[in-house]
Amino acid sequence: MEMKHGNLSINSDNIFPIIKKWMYSDHDIFVRELISNACDAITKLKKLDGAGEYTLPEGYKPRIDVIVDDKEKTLKFIDNGIGMTADEVEEYITQIAFSGATEFLEKYKDKTDQDQIIGHFGLGFYSAFMVADQVNIDTLSFQEGAKPVHWECDGSTEYDMGEGDRTQTGTEITLYLNEDCHEFSNVYRVREVLEKYCSFMPVEIYLSRHAEEPETEIIDEKDLREDDQVIERIHTDAKTEEKENDKGEKETVEVSPARDEVKIRKRPELVNDIHPLWAKHPNECTEEEYKEFYRKVFLDYKEPLFWIHLNMDYPFFFFFFI
């Protein structure tokens, strides 16, 4: 694919919603928009699998990764959803405010009535320019034989697009934060925003921090997972002591067992709950889950005095806390 230089096609009929997006007092809403787009992309891929038009890879686990780089002042949003071809990038990205979700729902409306596709990809995507001087997209479509696409724009009406190097189906969006928005290169600030907008999104969202020297943690070897990056294996011999028994005889007693541990690259932090209480029957919920839900939603360290959870015919549910 040859590198292409072009101009964004602005849909004048929808320019006012775009302007309103830029006028939001809460400029952190770009996080919600980009996460919503990633959820849409994953939902679409799963629907194609359900319709028999695509077969998900064995062991497929839908996920969204948010990676903060406080040195380079970048923020990445990565999903393993449907991805895009070059033609789709042209259609859904360079033509601002065109709704790819609407077109998709029209085609699959009989199969997706019970699902939520969240809005206009083009419009939500451009909220990224509320905080970034430049935005890059690297994407690979699920379609057989598709080539990876790289797209970048510096916030003007011009963009460059060419062949990318992504090898996994899905999309990676990189924001080069402007000077006024370096707060979003802080992992704690980004976690705060994710918890504000995305605590109950239906796809697992993982937050991590990119660093030249990787952050590490030590776990028990039995807790090692396939996707863990092992740095070092650590064996600790059992500790023993000489003690006197009831007969006055000395004997060797084990005071701590041998341990096999592993130093791994720190795992990304899961920041949302994909199985919120309102999606469960009251009989499936524990007392501690209700208390934790109350603390998380109402930001109150105290415990509620009591609560009522009614789960009637879909889509009605009711929570009441005191």
Can you name each region flagged by the protein language model?
Residues M1-E179, E183-F184, E192, S199, ...:
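GHKL (Bergerat-fold) ATPase N-terminal catalytic module, capturing the glycine-rich phosphate-binding loop
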